[in-house]
């Protein structure tokens, strides 16, 4: 898209004076032109100098660097976002690799824990259970009228930090910031939402500054009815919206996705987004290791909704590569806190029961106890891939990693739990324990590892590589649903962008500086899949590419003309 041409298209604005300066989507600060200052009654409200956005970015970046903690930097960036969104996204675009860990993981975890302390200004919607009969009114109160993407959480399972109540709002805000920074979704079209159903976190309930509903979490039929009321209200207000479920507890995440995925355009990023980015990374890693995904034996530590969602996506890809469903499932070993999931374990959840190993098939295994531990699985199954989604730090021990490497010359190891404090193993340790042989991708950002004079880049298996492209593809195609085929297309497009798989060297995943183009590529493949599966209108490839560019918002200042309400 031609930035200069786009910037010449004027916007007609009914606001003026201090009100205009308080409108983050429209405020330009010191970049208002002389003509605009005269037209919109801004004279005297701004310093004399008229600046370019580049000059504003330079000042903002200097101020950013003056803060010495990541949390302070997070607060500073959020303040810019709440003051001047165009400047915020231009700043992110200029320093994305440096700032993504600040606006999202790992720093957003601490911001959620301290949400009620660092709260400055309202953003998004707080829909509390006591006000459940007024949800329609709340949606009408939203400052953005043409909402196209909603990210909603109930705050119960925030990253690996557990129940944060309304502090979980930091996650939808951060996710939508990445929809815009990485996927070009206009901030005018996005809305973060937290469903305040109480909290079971005693630290929040006993905190005099906690800003949420001070009540134990509602559950069961009351909870489900409340979510249903919210979904119905959203469908009435914005029937074509894309809704992303975010950080719901395991007991609710999969049931909500199953209940609503065929009723509106929605997906769960923890289950489907994590699965898609992990699958894309695994396809690329398999190619880099000289094999295919169908040839891998994969062990998971963590058998919750996220881990099982990843496993099901991997199985679907293995089937696409020629295995039967039964053959694919025998290659997947799910381990949780009780050990390997087998057909003899009681009280398994529905989505876990499809991923059990038959205990009879393990009769020849040598194990240390009746419960089959992760180390037992590694010793007997000889996995080539180890994936951590446990939320528990340090569980990929030296003994486990070395045992895996003794059977696999090029192990693929992915400690995906975040934030950084929850990672199953540090990439530096994995590289050392495997003598530099492992392909490593992590859930949180890590610096490259230096080992025996060689530099090993550590790919961050970040959902930001996937969900912005999915959102852009849905908007560009007008898709009515998010299908498994669309998610599979996103994974394959991500794998195709891997420098390591393509060139034989470099990182497993693209550099963040290229993420906007990656999002465009993913959006195109997602949109094509939507058309093939009948959930979007058929168009030519050229028309689809034009729609993607048309929907890709860029952080530039446009000229303003005065109009009336």
From Swiss-Prot:
This is NAD-dependent malic enzyme. Pfam families: malic, Malic_M. Its cofactor is Mg(2+); Mn(2+). InterPro entries: Aminoacid_DH-like_N_sf, Malic_enzyme_CS, Malic_N_dom, Malic_N_dom_sf, Malic_NAD-bd, Malic_OxRdtase, NAD(P)-bd_dom_sf, NAD_malic_enz_proteobac. A divalent metal cation binds at residues 246-247, 270. One of its GO terms (molecular function) is malate dehydrogenase (decarboxylating) (NAD+) activity. It is an enzyme of class 1 (oxidoreductase). Divalent metal cations. Prefers magnesium or manganese. The gene is maeA. Belongs to the malic enzymes family. Homotetramer. Keywords: Metal-binding, NAD, Oxidoreductase. The keyword ATP-binding does not apply. The record marks 270 as: Important for activity. One of its GO terms (biological process) is malate metabolic process. It comes from the Bacteria. GO terms for cellular component: cytosol.
């Amino acid at each position: 898209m031609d930035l200069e041409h786009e910037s010449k298209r004027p916007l007609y604005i009914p606001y003026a004076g201090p009100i205009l300066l308080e409108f983050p989507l429209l405020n330009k600060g010191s970049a208002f032109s002389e003509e605009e200052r005269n037209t919109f009654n801004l004279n005297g409200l701004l310093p004399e100098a008229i600046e370019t956005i580049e000059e504003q970015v330079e000042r903002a970046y200097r101020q950013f660097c003056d803060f010495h903690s990541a949390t302070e930097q997070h607060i500073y960036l959020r303040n810019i976002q709440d003051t001047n969104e165009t400047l915020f996204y231009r700043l992110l675009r200029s320093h994305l690799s440096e700032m993504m860990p600040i606006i999202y993981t790992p720093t957003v975890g601490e911001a959620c824990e301290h949400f009620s302390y660092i709260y400055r200004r309202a953003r998004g919607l707080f829909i509390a259970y006591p006000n459940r009969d007024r949800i329609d009114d709340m949606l009408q109160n939203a400052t953005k009228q043409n909402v196209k993407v909603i990210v909603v959480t109930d705050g119960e399972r925030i990253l690996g930090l557990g129940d944060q109540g309304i502090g979980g709002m930091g996650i939808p805000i951060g996710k939508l910031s990445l929809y815009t920074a990485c996927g070009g979704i206009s901030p005018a079209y996005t809305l973060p939402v937290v469903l305040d159903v109480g909290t079971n976190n005693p630290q929040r309930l006993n905190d005099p500054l906690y800003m949420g509903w001070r009540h134990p979490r509602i559950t069961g039929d009351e909870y489900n009815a409340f979510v249903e009321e919210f979904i119905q209200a959203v469908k009435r207000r914005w029937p074509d919206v894309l809704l992303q479920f975010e950080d719901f507890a395991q007991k609710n995440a999969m049931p909500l996705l199953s209940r609503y995925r065929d009723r509106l355009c929605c997906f769960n990023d923890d289950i489907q987004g994590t699965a898609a980015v992990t699958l894309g990374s695994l396809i690329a890693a398999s190619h880099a290791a000289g094999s295919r995904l169908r040839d891998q034996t994969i062990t998971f530590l963590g058998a919750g909704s996220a881990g099982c969602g990843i496993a099901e996506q991997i199985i679907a890809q293995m089937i696409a590569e020629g295995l039967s469903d039964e053959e694919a499932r025998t290659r997947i070993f799910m381990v949780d806190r009780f050990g390997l999931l087998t057909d003899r374990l009681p009280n398994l959840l529905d989505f876990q029961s499809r991923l059990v190993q038959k205990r009879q098939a393990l009769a020849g295994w040598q194990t240390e106890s009746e419960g089959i531990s992760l180390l037992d699985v590694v010793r007997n199954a000889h996995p080539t891939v180890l994936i951590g989604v446990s939320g528990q730090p340090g569980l990929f021990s030296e003994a486990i990693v070395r045992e895996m490497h003794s059977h696999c010359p090029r192990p693929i190891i992915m400690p995906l739990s975040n934030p950084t404090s929850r990672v199953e193993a540090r990439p530096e340790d994995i590289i050392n324990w495997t003598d530099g042989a492992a392909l490593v991708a992590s859930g949180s950002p890590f610096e490259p590892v230096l080992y025996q004079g060689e530099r090993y880049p550590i790919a961050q298996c970040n959902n930001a590589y996937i969900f912005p492209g999915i959102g852009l593809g849905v908007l560009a195609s007008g898709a009515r649903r998010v299908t498994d085929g669309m998610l599979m297309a996103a994974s394959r497009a991500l794998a195709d962008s891997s420098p390591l798989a393509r060139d034989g060297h470099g990182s497993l995943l693209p550099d963040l500086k290229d993420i906007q183009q990656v999002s465009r590529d993913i959006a195109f493949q997602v949109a094509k899949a939507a058309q093939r599966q009948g959930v979007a209108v058929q168009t030519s490839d050229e028309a689809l590419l034009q729609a993607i560019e048309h929907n890709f918002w860029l952080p530039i200042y446009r000229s303003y003309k005065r109009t009336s309400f």
